[in-house]
Amino acid sequence: MGNYDQMAAAVSELSGGKNVVLLDDIGMPSIYVRIPKGKNSELVSGLSDNVHYAFNVDSVEKTAFYYSKYQNIIVNERAYSLGHRDPANSINWDAARKACENKGAGFHLATMAEWAYIALWCRKNGTMPHGNNNYGKDSAYTHEHGEESSKDSGKTGRCFTGSGPVTWNHNHHGDGICDLNGNVWEWNAGMRLVDGEIQIIPYNNAAMGSKCDMSASSTLWKAIKADGSLVEPGTAGTLKWDWVSGKIQLTSGAITYKTDSGVGGLYKDMTLASGLTAPEIAKMLLLYPDEPNGDYAGDYHWFNPVG
């Protein structure tokens, strides 16, 4: 057996095949969770039977995608998903993307489409993950805590990856994705705001990694019309986030809040501009809640409408 064959066999057996070990192009391991293909209607009642965007890469429908089980560490400018490590932190988007893509073909920074699918799956299945969002503990379940890996102002800051209880995993089981709630800030690829206009890399093409041009001037970025169709950025009537009456508002009109500062609020409290109906794509990419005023476990959205 190879250096990591026994590790891979053990990880697979202990998780019932739901976790896998994947090697990068220099033979170093990371542990991933396999996320099987799902439909929009399986996430939100009343939506279409279309397969979620996370499973469409370069016009090819995928049976699954693989998501890091653990928040990554960085070794020699490469990102690795391993348990009981102090996760990488204070890293910008470009460096995070590069660390993922440095591992070779197929490896990429987690995308907004993938993140959205997992979040919607958790809500549908009643397993919104708890986590280190209050100095090593969960703010709502204060008896739950992870193992400290760093201090912050004399209190627990970060926790070792995967050191919390199973409720800190996306499915509330040991074979799930750890630490999606809190611990460190995480970057996603494939979605950006430009002066409030929501722009995306279509489907899950951001998962193409280094083969996908996500530079500021890339022509791959598309805006979203009110009917859900994709158009060139700057087209009239595209979806935007505005800040209205102390809440994030989804609008297709002109932005009214033009202060260069971060604002945000509870995801459930987002509002719609008068006359606008949120298209399915907005709900599937977490641009607008599928159930306004519903229970999203206190999740927040933050944004800056300028720049």
Language-model segments: residues:
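Flexible loop/turn segments at secondary-structure boundaries
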Residues: 117, 192-196
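Short aromatic-cysteine micro-motif
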Residues: 50-180, 184, 209, 225
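Short secondary-structure boundary/capping segments
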Residues: 123-128, 192, 201-203
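C-terminal, surface-exposed recognition/capping segments
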Residues: 1-2, 144-158, 162-164, 171, ...
